[in-house]
Amino acid sequence: MAESHGGAKGPAAGAHTGAEGGHGGGFPPFESSTYASQLVSLAIFFVVLYVIVSKLALPKVGGAIEARQNKIEGDLAEAQTLRDQSDAALKAYESELASARSRAQAIGNESRDKANAQAETERKALEEQLAAKLAGAEKTIASTRTAAMSNVRGIAADAAGQIVQQLTGVVPDAASVNAAVDASLKG
């Protein structure tokens, strides 16, 4: 089939295929005669790519990774420092709290002991006052009883003497009336 430049004479018109297109052979990368030059070009390309990546890109990425690692380590160190500080502050707080509780307990015990001692002193003083008043009251009661009994004896002797006089018409002897009253009071 000859190539024509005039019009289209079918679906393959104007298409270059095979030797008709002016090229000889197949697809150039697959031709075995060009393998050596392709491998050299590929090796040069990878060496250039390796140099570019290792000299330009990797240091930047490595620097970023190292900076990030340093930042992480710094943050962890700072976090540990802050944690240590907070632990120390917590221990100090707990120590102060325990100390305050201990002081409050001691103050409470001391106040209770003082109040108990003061109450005991006041109780003893009050007991002594009450004992003195009771002794005085007992003396007063005893003297009043003695006085009342002596008055009762006198009243009883007078009454007995008058009763005997009324019944017998004779005035009894005062000594015999007193002896009879004393005998009756004793028993």
Curated annotation (Swiss-Prot):
Similarity annotation: Belongs to the ATPase B chain family.
Functional note: F(1)F(0) ATP synthase produces ATP from ADP in the presence of a proton or sodium gradient. F-type ATPases consist of two structural domains, F(1) containing the extramembraneous catalytic core and F(0) containing the membrane proton channel, linked together by a central stalk and a peripheral stalk. During catalysis, ATP synthesis in the catalytic domain of F(1) is coupled via a rotary mechanism of the central stalk subunits to proton translocation. Component of the F(0) channel, it forms part of the peripheral stalk, linking F(1) to F(0). The b'-subunit is a diverged and duplicated form of b found in plants and photosynthetic bacteria.
Chief location bin: membrane
Ranges of compositional bias, category Basic and acidic residues: 110-122
Pfam families attached to this UniProt entry: ATP-synt_B (PF00430)
Region Disordered: start-end pairs: 1-25, 103-122
Annotated keywords: ATP synthesis, Cell inner membrane, Cell membrane, CF(0), Hydrogen ion transport, Ion transport, Membrane, Transmembrane, Transmembrane helix, Transport
Membrane-spanning ranges: 39-59
Subunit structure: F-type ATPases have 2 components, F(1) - the catalytic core - and F(0) - the membrane proton channel. F(1) has five subunits: alpha(3), beta(3), gamma(1), delta(1), epsilon(1). F(0) has three main subunits: a(1), b(2) and c(10-14). The alpha and beta chains form an alternating ring which encloses part of the gamma chain. F(1) is attached to F(0) by a central stalk formed by the gamma and epsilon chains, while a peripheral stalk is formed by the delta and b chains.
PANTHER family, per the entry: ATP SYNTHASE SUBUNIT B, ATP SYNTHASE SUBUNIT B', CHLOROPLASTIC
Topological relation to the membrane, as annotated: Single-pass membrane protein
Name of this protein: ATP synthase subunit b 2
Cellular component, GO annotation: plasma membrane; proton-transporting ATP synthase complex
MF GO annotations: proton-transporting ATP synthase activity, rotational mechanism
Natural source organism: Bradyrhizobium diazoefficiens (strain JCM 10833 / BCRC 13528 / IAM 13628 / NBRC 14792 / USDA 110)
Superkingdom per UniProt: Bacteria
